[in-house]
Amino acid sequence: MSAFDLIVRGGTVVRGGCEVADVGVADGVISAVGPDLEGGAREEIDARGLLVLPGAIDAHVHFNEPGRTRWEGFASGTRALAAGGTTLCVEMPLNAHPPTTDGESFDLKLAAAKASAHVDFALWGGIVPGRVGRMEELAGRGVAGFKAFMSATGTPDFEAADDLTLYEGMQEAARLGLPVLVHAENRQITDALARRATSALRTTMRDYLASRPAVAELEAIGRAILLASEAGCSLHIVHVSTGRGVALVAAARERGVDVTCETCPHYLLFTDEDAVRIGAAAKCAPPLRPREEVESLWEQVLAGNVAFVTSDHSPCPPDMKAGEDMFRAWGGISGCQSLLPALLDEGYHGRGLPPERLAELLSANVARRFGFAGKGGIEEGNDADLALVDPSGEHVLREEDLHYRHPISPYVGRSFRGRVVRTILRGRTVFEGGRVVSGPAGRFVRPQREKGER
């Protein structure tokens, strides 16, 4: 009888450092890591010349199900994740209809995800006006935390949180022992500048970029940190687009505030000039920034002040990206399939980011922050979630390579150094040779988190 169900042989295993080793898997769990494992296996994979990374964890995706599967859906969205080396995602509460703001809406989303997810998943709940009293229902069902917007959401059925709603939501999250995630932009500034531009018929990409200045983000980050520190909750700032924003978070951590932040590949790879060149496919909020902001953000990533990198995959149908009016175009970037490839290309190859830091930014830190036990690292007892990467494999991303419902992405046409060749979920290959090779097998992951864990 074989000692293992699977052995991944001879790859460069990334865990703390890098070592050429085998990974033995039994019953979907990593049971041994070391050179020349003995005992045999029912399946062996030759990983010589490949990086063996923990499967990425994308803590920020919008799959729009139930109710808006014309936009994406768990089936196509998680196929794209598998193709990009991601084995666990956390799906956002807005854009679905109904949004995830109470127990009933959670149940609908959970059923949809269980039926069609190709990778494991967790779910965020929402903080919106009039629904703070329903947060306990969501906590009891296993949400990973709660998301709030400080600026307009673009979705009428998920309202932005006014300051009192945000503060009281933070107090409730603290009581429940769960984190609050905040989209931090000052709504008064962004709304007023947008009205000024559109009333003057200034609706180009440059006009849109100017309507969401960095100061709107910086002010909101500072305000969110203050409210969270007073409420006593764990705070996470999503999609920070400036190095100065990260610096505010780092300074607050030095003062003892329980706060972390993420950024996204599009803020690390693209500039405002790219947004002008690409058009609506590159519209997002906060927007893409000038080159000096990109460099400052990379400095913070390399200094260790950014906890992790997420895709903020936010797709829509093609008609919502059509036209020349950038204020009307949907503000979201499709990019979850490119999360790991983007960091391999620009981080590992372009900036000298070591593989072990790549694993921290895309896996370990996410699992630790949000309490995903058994995830995020290649260690005995953890789920056998692996991404096998050819670090020298170059490719140009084409529309036909994308697994999204709609092949719209600013990454199309970009050359990447580093290719995901196989994705393994709990010991089972789900992506290989450019194809998703298994049916929906994703499981719901509940957080196991102690209050104050950082």
Curated annotation (Swiss-Prot):
Q: Which SUPFAM superfamilies match?
A: Composite domain of metallo-dependent hydrolases (SSF51338), Metallo-dependent hydrolases (SSF51556)
Whether Metal-binding counts among this entry's keywords is: yes
What's its EC? 3.5.2.5
Record-linked PANTHER family: ALLANTOINASE (PTHR43668:SF4)
Q: How is the cofactor bound?
A: Binds 2 Zn(2+) ions per subunit.
What does this protein do, in the record's words? Answer: Catalyzes the conversion of allantoin (5-ureidohydantoin) to allantoic acid by hydrolytic cleavage of the five-member hydantoin ring.
User: How does this protein assemble?
Assistant: Homotetramer.
> Which pathway does the protein contribute to?
Nitrogen metabolism; (S)-allantoin degradation; allantoate from (S)-allantoin: step 1/1
**An example Gene Ontology CC term for this record:** cytoplasm
- UniProt keyword Metal-binding, yes or no: yes
Positions binding Zn(2+) 1 in this chain are 60, 62, 147, 312
Q: Post-translation: what modifications? A: Carboxylation allows a single lysine to coordinate two zinc ions.
- What superkingdom heads the lineage? Bacteria
Which reactions appear under catalytic activity for this entry?
Answer: (S)-allantoin + H2O = allantoate + H(+)
- GO BP annotations, alphabetical order: allantoin catabolic process; purine nucleobase catabolic process
User: How is this protein named in the record?
Assistant: Allantoinase
GO MF, one annotated term: zinc ion binding
Q: What family does the database annotate?
A: Belongs to the metallo-dependent hydrolases superfamily. Allantoinase family.
Q: Specify which residues bind Zn(2+) 2 according to the UniProt entry for this protein.
A: 147, 183, 239
